[in-house]
């Protein structure tokens, strides 16, 4: 999928949610990767721009980012960290995969919801993007978080001996 095709698909998704009355927040996680420019382009080309805001994460506003995510009812995550933070916050998430890394983590977590894969452009659509919201699909990752913490405890033990 080209960058232009991705932007157009995200415009359709953003416009779809905006038309349905949702407030849409486009979160830019990494300026260096072009997230902020992409968010601006998506907003500028979307219908009902008044329902769309851009949140620019700059490394100093982590608390505000987490607050925005915790107040959201649904997260469409185009970045690995967005997916993980959304799931950790107990939110319904629609992941957009750009590599197998996210796919494998989702499989390990037992995620069986809908997602898009950029290698399959047809999977990135408004109709697909709203399925997890409509079904209320969420997964509880509490046990995975606790297990991860135990792994770090074991690593600390190993490194300190």
Where are the model-predicted features located?
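Active-site anion-handling motifs in enzyme catalytic cores
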Residues: 1-161
